[in-house]
Regions:
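Right-handed parallel beta-helix
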Residues: 139-240
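Predominantly extracellular beta-rich ligand-binding scaffolds that present long acidic/polar faces
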Residues: 173, 192-204, 216-217, 221-372
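N-terminal secretory signal peptides that target proteins for export/translocation
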Residues: 1-14
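Acidic Asp/Glu-based divalent-cation binding sites
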Residues: 78-81, 88, 188, 219, ...
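N-terminal, post-signal-peptide segments of secreted/periplasmic proteins
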Residues: 32-159, 165-170, 304-426
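Sec-dependent signal peptide recognition
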Residues: 14-22
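N-terminal signal peptide c-region/cleavage motif recognized by signal peptidases
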Residues: 27-30
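Short acidic, low-complexity intrinsically disordered linear motifs used
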Residues: 425-435
Length: 435
């Protein structure tokens, strides 16, 4: 092991610490309520506003997820809802309202829904009735569980198969979530209209964008607000008519131009585009890997868009790595690599146009989500910006391992291009397959 390479135990501790820092390792206000969900039933609260989570089951001490959400909405200030290991919360109450009585779980006040314990991860199954969560107002933090079975294709309700973040929402943090098997016209898993939404260490896979509208899209994510996606993977989602996994749509209601910042993240093997940014939207990509998508890796469409990228790989996508509007504003001269010379990277010492990065398929290598890492002979190794932080490399990679690592042992440690920094903490560096 080279001196700069972390031990397996140290890496695991760093990941736990990073997750804690990303989430909520701070004391709650004294007035906060804490509810522990102990029932898988989908039953509302019997006396909303009394400060007690007590479902309408006639049994003392029964707290359902729906009842806990209703009590948290009625309780002033920030409240916590703790989920129980191994429980599956299947939503069964059909109907649409904003009170969390039926359909999705509506968040109207500051609330955290959490699972940070050991054991089998809880699952919130929307059961095809509607999405799982809708954040109307207040701040919301969702941590540590799976979101499945969401459907947003009802009349007047087409956005966010698993989660919808509305324009009036406050700070929204989504961390350590797995969102899979959800469907919507706009944002198969996540739809964001919010101005302060962050996705950290999440995995989106097998979500679908339906085709009921001509501008449907975003099989995993549709953004019309301000969204940061970091240390996350977006894999194997299916967009209709090639509209792809992540869509950034301009002209959000009552706000400025939408922005998506993609950092230390992997977007791979999606049906359609990896990322589609339309009109006056801004896409910022840092230390990311966008590869193996069925049509185009990144498309900047329409007029007035902005595309900024550094230390990132766009490669081996089905049709082209990039399709970029002639009117787009570009800032791409920052140690980037594409495999087919379509991303308008200036040829020179700080970019690598037309170079195959030689990556693995998305697999788990010890982090939360599947990632595509460099093969041992990959040209991305030690080729990113020589500076750490500021205008240079991110200080950690997608799996929260430190950068840089002197993988080749030549005494000169420098960051790798893309989401993953190759180190010796991998049993098999070069699997039989490649991306």
């Amino acid at each position: 092991m080279h001196p700069a390479t972390p031990s397996h135990a140290a890496t695991a501790n760093r990941r736990r610490g990073a997750a804690c820092a990303l989430l909520l390792c701070a004391a709650l206000p004294a007035q906060a309520a804490i509810f522990t969900v102990n029932s898988e039933a989908d039953v509302p609260d019997d006396a909303i506003g009394d400060g007690e989570c007590h479902a309408e089951l006639g049994l003392p001490g029964v707290c359902t997820l729906r009842a806990a959400i209703q009590e948290a909405n009625a309780s002033p200030g920030l409240d916590q809802i703790w989920l129980t290991a191994g429980q599956v919360y299947v939503l069964t109450r059909a109907g649409q309202d904003a009170s969390a009585a039926n359909g999705d779980l509506d968040i109207q006040d500051d609330v955290q829904v959490l699972f940070l314990a050991s054991g089998v991860r809880p699952v919130v199954d929307a059961n095809g009735l509607e999405r799982a969560f809708e954040v109307h107002e207040g701040s919301a933090t969702l941590v540590g569980f799976d979101l499945v079975g969401g459907e947003a294709s009802l009349p007047g309700d087409h956005s966010g198969g698993a989660i919808a973040v509305n324009f009036d929402a406050g700070i929204v943090q989504l961390s350590l979530l797995r969102l899979h098997g959800n469907r919507a016209n706009f944002g198969g898993a996540l739809y964001n209209d919010g101005a302060q939404t962050t996705v950290s260490a999440c995995e989106f896979f097998a979500n679908t964008a339906l085709d009921d509208f001509t501008d449907s899209g975003g099989a995993a994510i549709r953004n019309r607000g301000t969204l940061l996606v970091e240390n996350s993977s977006v894999l194997e989602n299916s967009g209709v008519d090639g509209l792809g996994a992540i869509a950034i749509e301009s002209t959000p209601p009552f706000s400025g131009e939408p922005t998506l910042t993609l950092v230390n993240s992997t977007v791979a093997r999606n049906v359609g585009f990896g990322v589609l940014s339309r009109d006056a939207a801004t896409l910022v990509v840092r230390n990311a890997t966008i590869a193996g998508n069925s049509t185009v890796g990144v498309r900047i469409a329409g007029a007035g868009g902005t595309f900024q990228m550094r230390n990132s790989v766009i490669a081996r996508n089905g049709d082209e790595d990039c399709v970029i509007s002639a009117t787009a504003t570009l800032n791409l001269d920052r140690y980037n690599m594409d495999s087919d010379d379509t991303c308008e990277l200036s040829d020179g010492s700080s970019n690598y146009p037309g170079v195959d990065p030689w990556l693995t398929p998305p697999m788990r290598r010890g982090g939360f989500a599947r990632v595509a890492w460099p093969l041992t002979h990959s040209p991305v190794i030690d080729q990113a910006h020589p500076v750490i932080g500021a205008i240079g490399c991110e200080e950690q990679d997608q799996d929260f391992n430190p950068r840089p690592v002197d993988f080749d042992g030549d005494g000169s440690a420098r960051c790798d291009v893309g989401a993953i920094e190759l180190d010796d903490d991998v049993v098999f560096h070069d699997p039989w397959e490649r991306l």
